[in-house]
Amino acid sequence: MNKYLEYPEVESKELPPQKLVVLLHGVGSDGHDLIGLVPYIKNDLPNCHFISPHGIEDYDMMPYGRQWFSLRDRSPHIIAKLIANNISKLEDIIREKQTELNLTNKDTVIIGFSQGTIIGLYLTLIQQKPLFCTIGFSGALIPPMKVNNKLTPICLIHGELDQVINVSEMYNASNYLSKLNIEHSGHKLTSLAHSIDGRGLEIAINFINTCHNIV
């Protein structure tokens, strides 16, 4: 087992699991953060196994926390290069768990928050085989050089008061996805800053439960 494969997870209520949900945290946090959402959603997603990997790097601007890529230089082309260099490590984590659970991309849901949304959307767009669906909270889209996957439905959720990543990034992402004819939806939540609330979780649950496998 490689060093990235130790992280919190929650088994599905119904066995064997039919879906793998991968929770991707924001910068400076770790997998223990988003796994805390599972008690609020698992009853509505009884056939889902949840994992919440830790970012693959130590957070480089504080003496604690993890990151998926550095934010010391926030130029989009630099971020895209850093993600491209690191994405295979996240894919390894997901593939390992898929193999263990006898699941594949078509059974896999990506849920990201903030930086987790950025890498989650990138991951989604480069897949050779489509994922079941992807949900991004309070994030942005940094597109890859080449888009391989235009079939995974995407749900974007963003607080209108977000001062960390402006809600305009949701609209930028939506415009990009529209140009590629990628099925997606966007939800601006009133009176919400850089956070996930009950409204967003309800949207996410409904999205997962209404998506259908892509053959």
Swiss-Prot record:
<feature type="active site" description="Charge relay system">
    <location>
        <position position="162"/>
    </location>
</feature>
<keyword id="KW-0378">Hydrolase</keyword>
<dbReference type="InterPro" id="IPR003140">
    <property type="entry name" value="PLipase/COase/thioEstase"/>
</dbReference>
<dbReference type="InterPro" id="IPR050565">
    <property type="entry name" value="LYPA1-2/EST-like"/>
</dbReference>
<protein>
    <recommendedName>
        <fullName>Uncharacterized hydrolase RP744</fullName>
        <ecNumber>3.1.-.-</ecNumber>
    </recommendedName>
</protein>
<dbReference type="GO" id="GO:0016787">
    <property type="term" value="F:hydrolase activity"/>
</dbReference>
<dbReference type="Pfam" id="PF02230">
    <property type="entry name" value="Abhydrolase_2"/>
</dbReference>
<comment type="similarity">
    <text>Belongs to the AB hydrolase superfamily. AB hydrolase 2 family.</text>
</comment>
<feature type="active site" description="Charge relay system">
    <location>
        <position position="114"/>
    </location>
</feature>
<dbReference type="InterPro" id="IPR029058">
    <property type="entry name" value="AB_hydrolase_fold"/>
</dbReference>
<feature type="active site" description="Charge relay system">
    <location>
        <position position="194"/>
    </location>
</feature>
